[in-house]
Amino acid sequence: DITKGSPDISVAIVDNGFNLKHPEFKGRVCGAYNVWRHSDKVDAHKVDHGTHVAGIALASMDNGAGSCGIAPQCAFIPVQVADEKDRMTTTSILDGILYAIYQGADVVNVSLGQCLNGLDEYSEAVQQELINNHFKEEERLWNKVMQIAEKHHCVIVFAAGNDNVLAGIDPQQRSQGCVVVSAVNKKNQPILKADFSNYGDYSTVSAPGVDIYSSCGDGYALMSGTSMAAPIVTGLVALLKSVK
């Protein structure tokens, strides 16, 4: 083992909410922020997406329970971008990412994005036309965010999405400075793309995303999605930064 992560390396998880009382995060939470309340009061949600995502990247080791995250000794910055009804906006996600960057996060995980349900009924040519010619204002905005992240030596990792369409239709995934993660099904031999995963030229890398075991609520659960694949890569980035 070269490293299990350094406490000097901080990982921000931008997500709907978190159970910060979960034992997997004991002693490693710093700089928690709720963009809706403008405070450090962070809540768990009924669909405990954020807690599960955070555990994949950061769950503790040697605590006699559950699972171990990819970077179990790195610091954890939880950033809640959903309100009490689990509503999120592009602005709240942007606020969360920028907060994490200026808070000094070394890597930011964003397992969130636009729902593109139904677009898989259209050909890849039509999907590529959307990427090439639409949402250009948003694309320029996200390019600026990535420039800010690069200036602060921060890596942004996005989940590719679960609509079985081309990655990059969502303009937050188009910047060269970000990492976009698709999902594979580890049960397939040879390993293949998960049925739901977005894919294509704007996908940077793939990681397991089917039946991933992690912290959830007060316990643990299996979840599937590119949301689960992204924090595996986020944890790896944190490990790489820990040995530099």
Map each language-model feature to its residues.
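Substrate-binding/specificity loop regions of serine endopeptidase catalytic domains
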Residues: 67, 90, 113-204, 211-234
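Alpha-helix termini
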Residues: 2-3, 64, 144-149, 244
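Small-residue (primarily alanine) positions within well-ordered alpha-helices
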Residues: 12, 96, 100, 105, ...
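Active-site core segment of subtilase-fold serine proteases
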Residues: 1-77, 81-88, 92-137, 187
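Hydrolase catalytic cores
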Residues: 54-57, 77-83, 106, 192, ...
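A structural motif
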Residues: 10-15, 181, 205-206
